[in-house]
Amino acid sequence: MKFVVITGGVVSGIGKGITTASIGRILRARELEVTAVKIDPYINVDAGTMNPFQHGEVFVTEDGVETDLDLGHYERFMDVTLSGAHNITTGKIYQRVIEKERRGDYLGETVQVIPHITDEIKSWIREVGKASGADVVLVEIGGTVGDIEGMPFYEAVRQLQLEEGRENVMFVHLTYVPYLEHVHELKTKPTQHSVKELRSLGIQPDAIVCRCERPLDDGVKRKIALHTNVPREAVIDAHDVDLVYKVPLLLERQGFGDYICERLGLDADEPDYSDWLDFVTRIEEADDEIRIAVVGKYVDLPDAYISIREALVHAGAHVGVGVDVAWVDSEALEAGDSEAWEEVKDADGVLVPGGFGKRGVEGKIEAVRYARENDVPFLGICLGFQLVVVEYARSVLGLEDAHSTEFNPDTDHPVVDLLPEQRGVKRKGGTMRLGAEPVVLEEGSLLRRLYDDREIVLERHRHRYEVNPSYVRELEDHGLRFSGHSPDGRMEALELPDHPYFVGTQFHPEFKSRPGDPSPPFVGLIKAAAGQGPD
């Protein structure tokens, strides 16, 4: 088993996740089995209770763990299914070590960062690699080198190379090379200092991947190679591209895949990018473009909806159209902002994603009503699904006070209510209905057709509230069709039969969308928005 450790320097947020996922794609193109681990040095046990404005999207794995959004990149680029074990946090590591100490596993030792914390980190990485049967384990360390919270993890991977052998562990350092416009020059000094910091921790990088606004010339690459002690061919240009799915191809063209295989002694096939190139080409050569209005409360940070965005791209490539996303603030709709409403009215389709909290909810409900009344293709996900029920109960059933008890505990018509098993639950972290659950699709329904007539599909969930079963019959008597349910009778999906495309899902279909296997509800939305009919 081989390991590739990806570290970052200079600044955070320059694309370690995409770089790691792209390395995974490069190795997968050579028919190698690859898995990935994301290390987040924060003390939170998981990402589930973190503000999306700080952290971005919470990505839910098949086994129901709330993880970092980079796991979504890994799954999409590498076409693999990962578990919650693939996201390590400081909180998880300390939790494990403290549990062992309480059990007496350390036989009276003084428990310390070295060796106990570092040993646990190494053990976790090896366990994930062994369980996956991977040829190569990618390990991405979040943050930047020098961050105090990351120190135990850098020490652990240093020890990992010492124990596994240099021939089995490779370090890739992602850095930022700024371009100063006033002198027309790319500056390498931040990279030099970043690598100096990394080497002070006992880690010599084997390759430097340089994020930059424009391509690096050969002179800059040679300068970086000289000052960071890596071969010239191991200085890789990762300049800005207009589509993240081009990044593996950009790295491959510079020989990075061959360099990794040579460095680790991997016996790999010639790379095959035919499917990947076809996907990228379909995006680039799309004749038409449609516009989808995504109505949410975190739209100032599109990373909060990154799986939504990518699922729209996947579906667009499948249908053969480009997808332009208009990010619409639901609070602005609520306030009657004319520009925000113009974005909705100019769109070919509307999507209301999941979310939490009362802020902006009425704006989302108004967006649902607009799409329903004006025959605009619509997809509601999780909270978006629940708000369809609220809007329908108010507008069609005449239950003016109808609401979710999440937002109005005293409503006379709780058409959306807390899941029975959630009553009495006090802890917030990891206690929702999470992960993959079976959904039974009704025969003859639009959703069943979109899912290739499969009766049961497995989709991922993240919610505490559900459609109140007491109102289901009345809603259906007034034309709303619940076309998907759980085996024990919970409402999982809905549609309006006489609408061009009006679908809601309690589950999150975006989490399982892949470039070569787009999510069916998203494909239906894009087809309808493009005027092709949903199925």
From Swiss-Prot:
The active site is at C382 (nucleophile), H508, E510. ATP binds at G13, I14, G15, K16, G17, I18, D70. It catalyses: UTP + L-glutamine + ATP + H2O = CTP + L-glutamate + ADP + phosphate + 2 H(+); L-glutamine + H2O = L-glutamate + NH4(+); UTP + NH4(+) + ATP = CTP + ADP + phosphate + 2 H(+). InterPro entries: Class_I_gatase-like (IPR029062), CTP_synthase (IPR004468), CTP_synthase_N (IPR017456), GATASE (IPR017926), GATase1_CTP_Synthase (IPR033828), P-loop_NTPase (IPR027417). Allosterically activated by GTP, when glutamine is the substrate; GTP has no effect on the reaction when ammonia is the substrate. The allosteric effector GTP functions by stabilizing the protein conformation that binds the tetrahedral intermediate(s) formed during glutamine hydrolysis. Inhibited by the product CTP, via allosteric rather than competitive inhibition. Its EC number is 6.3.4.2. UTP binds at S12, K187, T188, K189, P190, T191, Q192, K223. Signal peptide: none annotated. Residues 1-266 are annotated as: Amidoligase domain. Mg(2+) binds at D70, E140. L-glutamine binds at G355, L383, G384, F385, Q386, E406, R464. Keywords: ATP-binding, Glutamine amidotransferase, Ligase, Magnesium, Metal-binding, Nucleotide-binding, Pyrimidine biosynthesis. PROSITE patterns: GATASE_TYPE_1. One of its GO terms (biological process) is pyrimidine nucleobase biosynthetic process. The keyword Ligase applies. SUPFAM superfamilies: Class I glutamine amidotransferase-like, P-loop containing nucleoside triphosphate hydrolases. Transmembrane segments: none annotated. Pathway: Pyrimidine metabolism; CTP biosynthesis via de novo pathway; CTP from UDP: step 2/2. It holds the Pfam family GATase. Residues 291-535 form the Glutamine amidotransferase type-1 domain. One of its GO terms (molecular function) is CTP synthase activity. It comes from the Archaea. Catalyzes the ATP-dependent amination of UTP to CTP with either L-glutamine or ammonia as the source of nitrogen. Regulates intracellular CTP levels through interactions with the four ribonucleotide triphosphates. Homotetramer. Belongs to the CTP synthase family. This is CTP synthase. The lineage of its organism: Archaea, Methanobacteriati, Methanobacteriota, Methanomada group, Methanopyri.
